[in-house]
Swiss-Prot record:
It is found in: Host cell junction, Host plasmodesma; Host Golgi apparatus; Host chloroplast envelope; Host mitochondrion outer membrane. GO terms for cellular component: host cell Golgi apparatus; host cell mitochondrial outer membrane; host cell plasmodesma; membrane. It comes from Potato leafroll virus (strain Potato/Scotland/strain 1/1984) (PLrV). Belongs to the polerovirus movement protein P3a family. Its main location: host cell. This is Movement protein P3a. Keywords: Host cell junction, Host Golgi apparatus, Host membrane, Host mitochondrion, Host mitochondrion outer membrane, Membrane, Transmembrane, Transmembrane helix.
C-alpha cells in the first residue's frame, strides 16, 4: 500500500468537497431564482 498516494488522494478528495458543495449551492440559487420568477409570472396573471 502506497501511503503517500493514499494521503494525497484523501487530501485532494477532502479539498474538492467544498468546491462541489459551492457549485451545487450556486446551481440551487440559479434554479430557485428561476422558479421564483416563473411563479411570479403566474402570480401576476
Amino acid at each position: 500500500m502506497d501511503y503517500k498516494f493514499l494521503a494525497g488522494f484523501a487530501l485532494g478528495f477532502s479539498s474538492a468537497i467544498p468546491f462541489s458543495v459551492a457549485g451545487l449551492y450556486f446551481v440551487y440559487l440559479k434554479i430557485s431564482s428561476h422558479v421564483r420568477s416563473i411563479v411570479n409570472e403566474y402570480g401576476r396573471g
